[in-house]
Amino acid sequence: MMKKGIHPEYIPCKVTCVTSGKQLEVLSTKSELRIDISSFCHPFYTGSDKITDITGRVEKFRQKYNMK
């Protein structure tokens, strides 16, 4: 059983995905949240084959610090 008076109050919260612009409502202690990525636009959930090119970033890093 929860103690009275020590827990925060949960209120409806509007969560906005800044990548897709979609919104959903959940319960939280905050009234509004902005997130970078959600299940609306993440490749795992959408099934898209968007691959991030991290090889280029690694090569830039190695060139910057003269590493092999």
From Swiss-Prot:
Signal peptide: none annotated. GO terms for molecular function: rRNA binding; structural constituent of ribosome. InterPro entries: Ribosomal_bL28/bL31-like_sf (IPR034704), Ribosomal_bL31 (IPR002150), Ribosomal_bL31_A (IPR027491), Ribosomal_bL31_sf (IPR042105). One of its GO terms (biological process) is translation. Gene3D superfamilies: Ribosomal protein L31. GO terms for cellular component: ribonucleoprotein complex; ribosome. Keywords: Ribonucleoprotein, Ribosomal protein, RNA-binding, rRNA-binding. Pfam families: Ribosomal_L31. Part of the 50S ribosomal subunit. Binds the 23S rRNA. Belongs to the bacterial ribosomal protein bL31 family. Type A subfamily. This is Large ribosomal subunit protein bL31. The gene is rpmE.
